[in-house]
Amino acid sequence: MLASLPASLALVVALATSASAHAAFWDKSMYGFNVTAQTFSYDNRPQVPLYDMTFDQWWFHGHKDYPPNEGDFFELPAGGEVNAIISCDKGATPFYASSPGGDSGYGSDSPCPGQPTSEYHTTGIDDVKGCCMAIAYKADVNDVQPDDFVVFSCNATCVWTMNTKFEIPKLPACPEGGCHCAWFWIHSYDSGAEQIYMNGFKCQVTGDVGTQPLGKPAVPRRCGADPDHGRPDPVPGNCTIGAKTPMYWYQKEGNNMFEDTYDAPYYNQLYGFADGAQNDIFMDGVIASLASSGASSTLTSSADSLSAVASSTSYPAHPTSSQGAASTAYPSSSTDAASMTQPYPTSSSSSSTSEAQPTSSRSSTDVQTTLSAVTSSVSADSSTVSASSTPEDVVATTSTAESINPTRSCKPRPSGAAVQKKKRKHARRLHNAH
């Protein structure tokens, strides 16, 4: 007994330390609200990161069999805003009473009370990369597929405080039985191992609901300024405008993003996500440079083409050399269908056609307005592509031929042997730590 005491104490310390690391969305409406470290054969608490997992493990965090109580919904006031609770530990939230460890710091607005910022994967406020919420207009969780989700709100300074505001666009009403939503986060590549976070929850649009259906979502594309990787200027023409899917990255299967370890995708302007309500979601997702033609027929066909790539049932896993070397064009986040090898597992319940994600087409005027807004947003900090640039000016920075090519190649890593050696050392340290 005495001989085993040090090992037991070490385990307790390790569990206590890990209990406050990482972050999750917390609410009674969530799947896995009462999941503990002992529920699964592995630690699958809501705040545990998702990395190199099978589809069933990472999708809804593997918590579909742990639904919220009947009638528990997270309310989304159409055209308003909502406060979300983001924390490393359920015990530090208003829901501490149902936490295995009880109150562990509730009252602080820190996402991880008493812990350094490294516990929620950032070196400081200038290193946070944003998080988002997405919605699927399906009441049965077994009907929800990855391409049903549309990102409707982002917070660019997330994760930084426990109380995190999300602005809500004029969303239409949910079907009978409510909608499904999810919180997504990908942290800075230099502040933790490559991983994603996803927590699903039941949601309901309330108040003065809209009547405009959401557009068909497309995969986000890297288009913002990225000076850390040698791209000081944004390329707005490469943005996906309109409805966008969440970003599924670095899993064994089900990925729609294929950026490598040091090129993590983020829910911010780097991928065309504005801070706040995503008010362009009422048009089909399409590459900005294609939408600038002003022809609604071109927009519709382009959106259908892009969405077909995004919603294909086959996705490759991690990047491989077969995907080709980085091109001179700004990298796309869509993929060549011929290279797709790993399908989404199909649900045991067939999708309900009566609750399918509503879609819409928009006029060329709407497209031009949205394109101008995107141009202004991603160009705000650029001296080359100004906020007053016309759509034609923007398109000149990225050719249509480059943009419509569905083959995606990863962005080249920073040059220099010293830089690469430092990054490899950093990655090894992070993997050992997590």
Curated annotation (Swiss-Prot):
Binds 1 copper ion per subunit. One of its GO terms (cellular component) is extracellular region. Keywords: Copper, Disulfide bond, Glycoprotein, Metal-binding, Monooxygenase, Oxidoreductase, Secreted, Signal. Pfam families: LPMO_AA14. Glycans are attached at N34, N155, N238. It is an enzyme of class 1 (oxidoreductase). Residues 339-365, 372-390 have a biased composition (Low complexity). Residues 1-23 form the signal peptide. Its EC number is 1.14.99.-. Belongs to the polysaccharide monooxygenase AA14 family. This is AA14 family lytic polysaccharide monooxygenase A. It comes from Pycnoporus cinnabarinus. The gene is AA14A.
